Amino acid sequence: LALTEAEAADRGIAAVLEAAVGRPLTWDQDDVALQNIQARVRGPSVWLLANLENALLLATSNRSEAAVGYATMDGDTCGGLSPIAGIDKSYLRHWLRWLEQHGPSGSHPIPALAAVNVQQPTAELRPPSEHQTDEADLMPYDVLEAVEDSAIRDKRVPLEVFLELSPRFPQVGAAQLAAWIERFFRLWCKNQWKRERFAPSFHVDDKNLDPRSWCRFPILSGGYERELAELRAHLARVAGP
């Protein structure tokens, strides 16, 4: 779809939904829903192209997005294989900078990647005036990867993750780090249903989030409520009266 056609489809779907719910959809009240409309509008066209070419559609999700469900089901998750879903976003960004500046042995760097690497990762689903970025929505990707390693690979509870990562990120305040850790655990629990439906990927390092081959987790759970309460209680004790 051309950009104008995609925008027209987005507006048309929004108008139908507004009539169904009996009120206007606004970014203040319906942020996630409006973002997801845009992501899903793209799905039919890419599936159509794959069908026309009798091709395997590749999905774009990486492991960091899978961990916290930062993807639109039936939107950017469309596909039959997800080539980079076995690596974290921070590793992917480091790798792209390495390709730009050095490149593999016997080959050459790819300076054109500078146009990609200079940009902040963004879903580009909110209005441009919002200057949306992934890290503002979630947390810095290097922190997210560290929390994921500690919580999922090493099977630590929130307080243990906090105690492990505090010395590694001294520039981050205790309250902020604890808030990011809580966000990770809540999003992890909330989005297991998405991981059950993501396209398969490759196991390339010491962990994988694919529930069919490595990381089982219940779709419905207690959400680490008791363990997160322990983290908040520890933070209150450290802060003092």
State what each model feature region is.
Residues L1-P241:
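ATP/NTP-dependent adenylation/nucleotidyl-transfer catalytic domains that generate, transfer
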